[in-house]
Amino acid sequence: MAARPSAKEVIELVDVEELRRAPIAILGGGAVGKTCGADCALAGQEVRICDLDPFFDNALGTVMRTGITLQDKAPGTQTKYGFRRMGKGEFAMATNSVAEAVKGAKLIVVGIPSIAHEIFFRELIPALEDGQIVHIIPDNYGSLKLRKMMREMGCTKKVIIGGWSSAPYGTRVDTEGGVAKPTCSLVYRAITLRGAALPAKDTEDFVESSKALGCFDAITEGDGAVCGDTVMDIGFSPM
């Protein structure tokens, strides 16, 4: 079977520049969500970040005042091609409402553990809008669950849904005395990731749209994102 093309080889399928100018919704206030959100903000994008109660206050209660600062994890962030972006990312919105976060957003990043997928998806599905692209990072079969729940809830919105084999970073929320600080330390930045969409016919559009995410810039400028065969293929990738 012929290999799928990498994102760099795909003819322009989605309007990357239009997507890059649109608001981005980040669902999840943990290390992946905070780092992806701050990275996109540092790339000049409008970012809204969301976590659900009862976690919102601890995770994001002060983020509108403090922002999230990205910094190296000693001895330094590993990155093959020298990509570097550090500093304080400022958010346009921090909310405990998924509907508020995703309204009018073109790109939605789901950066939460798979155990929380169902809880977030029940809030997300009624708020989906035609034309949105959902990136589940990492997928962990979240794309399958989201499509299944959309059918069960009668959602027929025309959206692209896919997931990635891993997060674009090794990252941790810094703590002091058991209290989370407004900083995330990066151990490494990925230079390539594999992604796929459900249905598979959307995969090339899905992978191409990653070029519009600031949190994928080290990948876009590295070896590029690659189309996986199916979301099952992506789900097995971290194992």
Question: Each predicted region: which residue ranges?
Answer:
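Short, aromatic/basic amphipathic alpha-helical patches
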Residues: 60-63, 146-152, 207-212
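Substrate/ligand-engaging "lid" and interaction regions
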Residues: 168-239
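A general structural motif
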Residues: 21, 44, 105, 129-131, ...
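NAD(P)+-binding Rossmann beta1-loop-alpha1 motif at the extreme N-terminus of oxidoreductases
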Residues: 2-80
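Rossmann-like NAD(P)-binding element
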Residues: 81-137
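Rossmann-like NAD(P)(H) cofactor-binding subdomain of soluble oxidoreductases
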Residues: 114-180
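Internal, conserved structured core segments that host functional sites
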Residues: 62-73, 109, 224-239
